Amino acid sequence: MKVRASVKTICRNCKVIRRNGVVRVICKDPRHKQRQG
């Protein structure tokens, strides 16, 4: 899980979602998981 100021999709399987006011990237590649913070 990377914590970044700006989250971007890395591959085409990445999806930007908003969960409890936190912007996240979910992907089937676990290295692409990101959270805004």
Curated annotation (Swiss-Prot):
Keywords: Ribonucleoprotein, Ribosomal protein. InterPro entries: Ribosomal_bL36 (IPR000473), Ribosomal_bL36_sp (IPR035977). GO terms for molecular function: structural constituent of ribosome. One of its GO terms (biological process) is translation. Pfam families: Ribosomal_L36. One of its GO terms (cellular component) is cytoplasm. SUPFAM superfamilies: Ribosomal protein L36 (SSF57840). Belongs to the bacterial ribosomal protein bL36 family. PANTHER family: 50S RIBOSOMAL PROTEIN L36, CHLOROPLASTIC (PTHR42888), LARGE RIBOSOMAL SUBUNIT PROTEIN BL36C (PTHR42888:SF1). This is Large ribosomal subunit protein bL36. It comes from Thioalkalivibrio sulfidiphilus (strain HL-EbGR7).
